[in-house]
From Swiss-Prot:
Listed PROSITE patterns: PEPTIDASE_A1
Pfam families linked to this entry: TAXi_C, TAXi_N
Single Gene Ontology MF annotation: aspartic-type endopeptidase activity
Domain Peptidase A1: 60-425
GO (cellular component) term, any one: extracellular region
Protein name, UniProt field: Gamma conglutin 2
Amino acid sequence: MAQNMAPIFHFIAISLSCSFLFVLSSSQDSQSLHYPLPTSSSKPSLLVLPIQQDASTGLHWANIHKRTPLMQVPVLLDLNGKHLWVTCSYHYSSSTYQAPFCHSTQCSRANSHQCFTCTDSATTRPGCHNNTCALMTSNPVTQEAGFGELAQDVLAIHSTHGSKLGPMVKVLQFLFSCAPSFLAQKGLPNNIQGALGLGHAPISLPNQLFSHFGLRRQFTMCLSRYPTSNGAILFGDIYDPNNNYIDNSVEVLLDMVYTPLGISLQGEYLMQVSAIRVNKHIVVPTKNPSMLSSNHGDSRIGGVMITTTNPYTILHHSIYEVFTQVFANNIPKQAQVEAVGPFGLCFDSKKISGGIPNVEFVMDSPDDVWRISEENLMVQAQNGVSCLGFVDGGMHTRTEIALGAHQLEENLVVFDFAKSRVEFNSNPLKSHGKTCANLFDLNNA
């Protein structure tokens, strides 16, 4: 009888063990998320990351979901950053954290060829192991840099479900840098714990998502002007007819213009702009051959870097002088007031209420123009004073123009790596009755 009962007890033991593992797994997910994760068989075609603006700095940031159990981690949006980095010195707790050994496959993928030795702590912890990979990490605002530990952990991001925000999907071994804490102590908005790199690098967020989920190599950015509402970054093909996440805004997609997308030696995103027009007057800069740009002759501006870590557009001095002079000449002289730093051209807000000059960036083709709205051009520097939101970068800028976050806000910007081009909505979103906040359904984000 005992021999006959043995298989039964064995079956019951296995069943109870499986039930326990299922309950444990479900309870861990329910502690960190309020909605179920999709099954492993689901394959998203579009991923969504909500983005917010910081009112005090004008920079943009996102809550990413990392670790086990999942936690929200606020990080700065760094369009040209090489990878995600977060500070791990304190309060980093995760059951799935790993630090790959030096010279491992993960290190090669991250272009890390130097071993990391931790001297900060007598005991090992996230960010502090020996014989791991060293990854140079920098604060994109202060330019401070230091070595972090290459690490991998779970990352989760929203998928889409029709025109709605869908459940989260996971990358189980997402590579990032566990960076020293001093990198987050200056220049960043309050409570920000790192930076999210979207640049042209092997382990940037886009490249890891493209590779892991098999997405089309394209991401779309829409930065909100308002700290109280979200913008978003979409990873995947927004033009795919099967992706109807922004079906209610198809007229915006029909208003896109494009120009070649270039990559600098440092992996930064560049776009080709042939001229700036102010009330149809073409602004032509003095050409500086030492600047990073395309060789199209003296009448072309060349490479324009797109950034999110400069709050305002920075112009090489030769361009800034001509641009501000032409702009000022199109506004009554009595409207001009003393400049408020960091800006060099400011006006009495009441005296320019009748309108300001039209400014357009002419793309690679003269028929393709990006019209910059008044809200993107002007900044309320102080009560009653409006300033042109462009900054003189001096004579030694690396690029002739570095587009800043303020000028990018409330614009749809598509980075299409498959076609090597960047796209902008030709007319401001508001001309279509849209904002970044209502272009996408970000409920439950």
